[in-house]
Each structure stands twice: as C-alpha cells, then as structure tokens.
C-alpha cells in the first residue's frame, strides 16, 4: 500500500510501434486506474534486449513509448511513468530472485519455448530468465495487482511462487500479487488473420493498425481487412473477420455490437470497412496530435523522465534494502 492505495504495476516493451490493440485493450483503460491504485507504468527496455536491438532505434522507441503513455492521458503526477533501465533495483532484485527460482520452473515457461524457436540463433540466458526479471519488476514495488493477458499469466504465477517461497524463508517481505480483474478492454485481432491477436510484431504489415499510422494508411488497411463470403454483417463467432471489424468500430465509438449491427443493416462489407476506418482515424487523431505536441517539448519530457525515475528508485530502494538485509548482505554505511 502507498498513500492508502493498493499498488498496480504494468509495462510494455519498446520493441515496436504500439498497435490499436495495445491502445484499446490496455493503455486506454490504464488512464482511469490511478483513482483507485498507486500505479507504476514502466517502459520495460531491459526486457527488450533479450533479442538483439539496434541501440539508437531502441532509445528512440523507448522515448516514443513513454511519450505515448503521456499522450494517452497518463498523468505523471498521479502515476509513476519511467524507464525500467533507469532504476537499478530491477537488475539487483532480479539477481537475488534468480537464486530462489528453480531451473525446472523456467524450463516450463511456454514463452521461452516460443521465443527461442523464433530466435534460434540467439537463445541467451536473458531470454531464459526473462520471467525472473518480470518477477523483480512486480515485487520491487510491492505490487498488489498486475493487469495481465492470458499469455503472461504463467509468468505471474511464477512471480507469486517466488514471493511465497522467499516469504516462507525470511518472513513477510514481499506482497504476493494478484492478477488485476477489472474492466476488460477490447480484444482486437489481426486484420489479416482474425484468429490471432493484433500484434506489433506481425510480419504482415496490413494485419496491424499502428497508433501513429496516418489516415490514408489506416483506411487502406481497413479496406484490405479479411472478411468472408457470407455477405451479411452479423456479430457472431462464425464470422471472425466481421466480428473483429465490429469490435474495433464499437471500441472506437463507444457503441455496443447490437447498435453497430443495426447501423450497418442492409449495407455491404465495403461500407463497414469504410466506417471502421473513419472511426479509427477519428479515435486516434487526439492521441496523435498530443504526441506531436509533446515531442516538441523536449525539456518537459526530460523532466518527466528524470523525476519519475527518482520516484521509482525511491520506492524500489525501500524493498531492495529490506531484501538485501534479509539474505545476509552487509548494510550500507551512511
């Protein structure tokens, strides 16, 4: 607890451009959480280097992601918005937690198997111990809740296991985090393969709408979206392409599926795609305008980065010093 509020931690990697799915499914919902929680939102750039990155590109993407956090409406006075790499406690705690994590637990992580298959030429130790760094990210701030998707639930369970194991040995040190169950954001699927989630790493550039895509690009991608041969606009699982377009339309305009279906009754797929494209362009314009404004104010962004890193380090040190003392490290001389 901080300021009588439960603590919430979440973060995104700076390895690509955020998609409409990231925005509607997560980022848009983060904005309201600071009323109920003390929120830590990280640009998790340390996780990014488990796959080779061009240094200049990584720095550029990290800054762009932090700018998007702010443009989306996250208040840096109410939330702690920071680069993971600017808080040394993440790496320090991760090393200690490595010593309380079993090889067998890490071997069972499905994401390691998936990522190592995709990057067979670079199966490094960091990729293997990625879930331990994720555990450190969460436990460092004594997070009570963590918003996670199904693909990250296994990592959160490992985090809980590590925290409980450590507490059983040394006493009540870590808060054991729970999965955040709140307002469910829209689940946006690929425009080219509606059976899989819209992803910033999609090899098909037409499958994802990126938050900084210009209007012409957005309209073109929507027009090329996969549909079916039913020639009927209905919200049902049997028509995943149409259902996905309706989900996007509803999420952008705050409508229900029933309202959207009635609106497009008797119309063709072309009109639906046009309507979806226009809805996305309209929904993203305020965000894009705010990004453009923030990017011009380098001094302001730099001040946010500095102040929030210091705030995060302050809370991180409170946990880290306690953990270091518990495991037997010598106390620092002040």
Regions flagged by a language model, labelled:
Residues 2-9, 14-136, 279-282, 292:
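N-terminal Rossmann-like or analogous alpha/beta NTP/dinucleotide-binding catalytic cores
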Residues 12-14, 45-47, 144-145, 202, ...:
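Short, histidine-centered active-site or binding-site loop motifs used for metal coordination
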Residues 22, 154, 160-334:
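Conserved nucleotide- and phosphate/pyrophosphate-binding catalytic cores
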Residues 38, 103-107, 140-147, 251-260, ...:
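Short helix-capping/linker segments at secondary-structure and domain boundaries
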Residues 45-46, 135-139, 194, 251-254:
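Short connector loops/turns at beta-strand edges and beta->alpha or beta->beta junctions
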Residues 114-166, 170, 190:
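Internal, conserved structured core segments that host functional sites
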């Amino acid at each position: 607890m901080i300021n009588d509020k439960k603590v919430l931690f979440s973060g995104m990697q700076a390895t690509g451009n955020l998609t409409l799915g990231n925005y509607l499914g997560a980022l848009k919902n983060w904005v309201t959480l600071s009323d109920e929680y003390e929120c830590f939102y990280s640009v998790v750039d340390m996780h990014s280097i488990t796959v080779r990155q061009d240094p200049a590109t990584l720095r550029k993407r990290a800054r762009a992601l932090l700018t998007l956090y702010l443009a989306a409406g996250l208040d840096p006075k109410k939330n702690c918005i920071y680069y993971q790499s600017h808080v040394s406690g993440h790496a320090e705690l991760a090393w200690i937690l490595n010593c309380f994590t079993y090889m067998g637990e890490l071997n069972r992580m499905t994401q390691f198997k998936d990522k190592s298959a995709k990057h067979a030429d670079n199966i490094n130790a960091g990729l293997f111990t990625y879930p331990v760094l994720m555990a450190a990210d969460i436990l460092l701030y004594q997070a009570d809740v963590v918003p996670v998707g199904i693909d990250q639930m296994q990592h959160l369970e490992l985090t809980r296991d590590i925290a409980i194991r450590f507490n059983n040995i040394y006493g009540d040190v870590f808060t054991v985090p729970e999965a955040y169950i709140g307002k469910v954001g829209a689940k946006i699927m690929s425009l080219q393969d509606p059976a899989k989630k819209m992803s910033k790493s999609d090899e098909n550039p037409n499958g994802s709408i990126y938050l900084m895509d210009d209007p012409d690009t957005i309209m073109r991608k929507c027009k090329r979206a996969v549909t079916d041969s039913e020639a009927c606009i209905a919200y049902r699982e049997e028509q995943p392409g149409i259902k996905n377009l309706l989900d996007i339309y509803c999420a952008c305009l705050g409508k229900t599926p029933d309202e959207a279906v009635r609106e497009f009754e008797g119309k063709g797929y072309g009109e639906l795609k046009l309507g979806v494209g226009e809805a996305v362009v309209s929904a993203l314009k305020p965000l894009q305008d705010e990004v453009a404004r923030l990017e011009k104010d380098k001094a302001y962004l730099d001040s946010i980065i500095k102040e929030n890193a210091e705030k995060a380090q302050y809370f991180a040190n409170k946990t880290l010093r306690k953990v270091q003392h518990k495991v037997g490290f010598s106390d620092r001389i002040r």
